């Protein structure tokens, strides 16, 4: 269902069962996969490809990179399947200098007012809590959790299944499976809760713990 107040460019491509709510604006080079729901007041422009089964909440803005060097070049944003993008989230396509592409995987949750900057690479099953900005070129691997009001510096890499505590300033890379907290983040150990939730065996957790000693 397409609301009568939505403005959708005739060149946009919407697959079957896409829903677009009131007062949305969708540009000409946008592709939206089937069964995706776009609620009210959402703006999507640029070369954007959105997969299947996503849910995009009110006042989300997907628009040009926030980079002074960006001069309107055709760059890309690719979003996978079954993601939840909550209110006031902002997502930017890539820049020419950063490879020209921002990529988001599948089954992620982006909570209210989080920001995915240009050229970020976000894996699958990632949870980014409220008010978390990712700086440009950040790499967030699969199954990462980032606590609320944290900030991730540009060019930072967070390894798979790592957890970032709330209100953490991430200035350095974080190892896979690590737990990092602090105003200037420091490694506190393994993300034991996440490992147990993922049903890692005790012997594997022990092996990771022993490896951590040598870092």
State where each predicted segment sits.
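Structural signal for interior beta-strand "rungs" in well-ordered beta-sheet cores
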Residues: 2-186
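ABC transporter nucleotide-binding domain
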Residues: 175, 182-205
